[in-house]
Amino acid sequence: VAYLPSALSRRLGAGAALVAIGFSGSAGLLAPPALAQARKPGTPAPPQELLLVTYAVTKAAYDEIFPLFAADWKKRTGQTVTFKASYGGSGSQTRAVIDGLEADVVHLAMASDVNRIEKAGLINPGWQRENPHNSTPVNSTVAVFVRPGNPKKINSWADLNNKDVEIVAANPKTSGGARWNYAALWGSVTENGGTDSAARAFILGVYKNVDVLPKDAREATDTFVKRKKGDVLLNWETEAILARRKGEWTVPYKLFSPNVLTEQPATVVDRNVDRKGTRRAAEAFVRFLFTPPAQAVFAKNGFRPATPAGKAAARGRFQQLKFFTIGDLGGWDAFDKKHFGKGGEWDQIFRRSR
């Protein structure tokens, strides 16, 4: 299936020619970019290195995706592309890029983090329209991990508010996954007919049960699994699926409805790719994330594919839930301002829960 990125002319400049990138289902991963025709035959572009800055739980997937893209890009264009990657809490990664970490591509836990980089002048407006599904190649949801046998009888969202339950959850100030945890908890009330007041009281009760707030999703998992802290862990569904596939641990987990369908966008960092001359390869890499081979890798590593073809290929792999989106909660801009702005809901809940 071929498509023409609608905003590509904006990224390359008003006078630049539009370039169609085609995806095929199996035989080839990327059709040869038209830009390659401008280079004299037999003279591929010099080798380039791309830096991906992403959130903590994507590493296993990208360890497989990098060589897939590099091999196909080499075959199609003759150019050698290598990768470096930085993994960490999405909020911390966002600040690092704004502060000067020279990412060519970011794949972050939420659109609001990408918007912060845009507001800093590093990403051009309109990035959401660059690729399908608001430039979001994968989804996930929030899982509730319990101890074997579920001794605390955690069978619904409401059970997290029991006073004898000790919860491990990452810090929403540093972790994108933690903000999704918070959104899932809030929406479990409001998307089920409850009021903001009821949601506030519920979340306060939950976070009173949180003893420590690790900086990111991976550290939260280590706290629960390796250090045996807590009765319950709130984390990505991705973490459970990946860990089981790799045989690292088999902690039981539950998925409750309604739940939030998390959306993790990817895009190029315009100022950096233009300065470094890596735009062509960086944009192709982001588009590659939406191809069937990349979607299959994401699914194998616990991410819910975002594309129709990816979803069809992964049918039966993921539990069906009643989902709501951050859009149902007002969108990230409004939700962040209300909940994570200075003096917002989270600051008040944190102060009262300590």
Model-flagged regions — what are they?
Residues N192-S257, P265:
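Ligand-binding pocket segment of bilobal, Venus flytrap-like solute-binding proteins
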